[in-house]
């Protein structure tokens, strides 16, 4: 079915179709003007045989009266092994100058969330091999994790380590959605992934990640839908290949922001703080598809930008309702050189309950947090009066807390290039055992430097003998 463009206002196009031949909502429409072709998505039916569509790329140079073809289906993107190691835009076209991919298997980006009978209801912990995460704020398999942190505290390195570890330990793959962030960051991430071996440029099918970018320079339609493009690729790995998949969304706030721009352009009445009235629905449609089924799981890690550090802003507040865990990166720890700079007291998880993780894990995590909290309270006294003014008991506690703080650091596989020390994957049992030994005072005679940037506790003991 073909119609013609009757109005263009920025990224919004009004298209008129012959009577009785209107396209369905969310269908893709291709508008062609000479060499230029723009794909749009139907958002509203206006009456008078007109639809209002939002463009996925720039509408510069388009004119009224040009032809518009209804494709009869939503935007569809390639899925499967061909996507690994490649960079896609919202329409599933490659943007890495390495040629096109074969569109043997394609899937529409709009789908229903899995039905209740398909879901895996028993909560299970997703082991990452990163001590601080597994012990203090464990991730749920098929859950959603919020990643909070400013610039330069190690967010990218943490993301790459997770991609690396899921491939090694779980045989899973990852999909990365760059939503409305800087193009330079997208390029840096791609180059770092090639350098660290997460993307194998010689043999792309051996890569561990597929990338979907809709960056800041894209129109709001593309930024609003690129998250769904990545999610569709992830769903294929989960449902068809029956794998555990990690889905990274950077940044979930930009998804909401793009939705807000589109909503205003479509003439909807804004709600609180100028956001779209459909905020909760749009967020829910994305988040409900991220889940654990009987076949496999999609575990999602979402970077959350908090506008003006106001946690009550509708965008972050709506996001929090969906999160199972939060990983907060701290500038103070990064300044001390403790990487990963995950704040052990600010990071939380709904999984940290004795009936889910077991009594030993729960007790050890609680004692670690108590020790670090007490150390934090004593820091003012230490700064003013010095360590010598503390009681014997408090001095012992401070010594153990400093060891714990250092033992929470860990050498990463993807950072071997910078640190020169080989990366370590630490199992949950080893993590619990190590922290329990420090808390029980079994290692009080070891120097605190021995615990810095090591894997398990045996390595710390070996390092102490060399010091």
Curated annotation (Swiss-Prot):
GO terms for cellular component: chloroplast thylakoid membrane; mitochondrion; proton-transporting ATP synthase complex. ATP binds at residues 149-156. The keyword Repressor does not apply. Keywords: ATP synthesis, ATP-binding, CF(1), Chloroplast, Hydrogen ion transport, Ion transport, Membrane, Nucleotide-binding, Plastid, Thylakoid, Translocase, Transport. Its EC number is 7.1.2.2. Pfam families: ATP-synt_ab, ATP-synt_ab_N, ATP-synt_VA_C. This is ATP synthase subunit beta, chloroplastic. The gene is atpB.
């Amino acid at each position: 079915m073909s119609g013609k463009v009757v109005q263009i206002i920025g990224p919004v196009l009004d298209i008129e179709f012959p009577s009785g031949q209107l396209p369905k909502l969310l269908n893709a429409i291709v508008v062609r003007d000479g060499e230029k072709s723009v794909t749009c998505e139907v958002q509203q039916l206006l009456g008078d045989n007109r639809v209002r569509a939002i463009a996925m790329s720039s509408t510069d140079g388009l004119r009224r009266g040009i032809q518009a073809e209804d494709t009869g289906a939503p935007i569809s993107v390639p899925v499967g092994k061909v996507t690994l190691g490649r960079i896609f835009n919202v329409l599933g076209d490659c943007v890495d100058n390495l040629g096109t991919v074969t569109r043997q298997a394609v899937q529409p980006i709009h789908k229903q969330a899995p039905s209740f009978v398909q879901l895996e209801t028993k909560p299970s912990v997703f082991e990452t091999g990163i001590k601080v995460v597994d012990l203090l704020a464990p991730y749920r398999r098929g859950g959603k994790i919020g990643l909070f942190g400013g610039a330069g505290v190690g967010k990218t390195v943490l993301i790459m380590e997770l991609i690396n570890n899921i491939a090694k330990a779980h045989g899973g793959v990852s999909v990365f959605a760059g939503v409305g962030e800087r193009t330079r960051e997208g390029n840096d991430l791609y180059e770092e992934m090639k350098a660290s071996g997460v993307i194998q440029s010689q043999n792309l099918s051996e890569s561990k990640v597929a990338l979907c970018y809709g960056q800041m320079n894209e129109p709001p339609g593309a930024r609003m839908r690129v998250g769904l493009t990545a999610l569709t690729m992830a769903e294929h790995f989960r449902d068809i290949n029956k794998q555990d998949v990690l889905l990274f969304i950077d940044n979930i706030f930009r998804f909401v922001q793009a939705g807000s721009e589109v909503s205003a352009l479509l003439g909807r009445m804004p709600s609180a703080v100028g956001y779209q009235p459909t905020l909760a629905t749009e967020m829910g449609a994305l988040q409900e598809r991220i889940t654990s089924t009987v076949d496999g799981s999609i575990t999602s890690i979402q970077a959350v930008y908090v506008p003006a550090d106001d946690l009550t802003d509708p965008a972050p507040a709506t996001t929090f309702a969906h999160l199972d865990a939060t990983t907060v990166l701290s500038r103070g720890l990064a300044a001390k050189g403790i990487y990963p700079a995950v704040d052990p007291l600010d990071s939380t998880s709904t999984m940290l309950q004795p009936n889910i993780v077991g009594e030993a894990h729960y007790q050890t995590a609680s004692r670690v947090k108590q020790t670090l909290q007490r150390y934090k309270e004593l820091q003012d006294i230490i700064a003013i009066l010095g360590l010598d003014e503390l009681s014997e008991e408090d001095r012992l506690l401070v010594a153990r807390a400093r060891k714990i703080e250092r033992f929470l650091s860990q050498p990463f596989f993807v950072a071997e290039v910078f640190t020169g020390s080989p990366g370590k994957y630490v199992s949950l049992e080893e993590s619990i055992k190590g922290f329990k030994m420090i808390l029980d005072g079994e290692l009080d005679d070891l120097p605190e430097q021995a615990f810095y940037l090591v894997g398990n506790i045996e390595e710390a003991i070996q390092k102490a003998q060399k010091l």
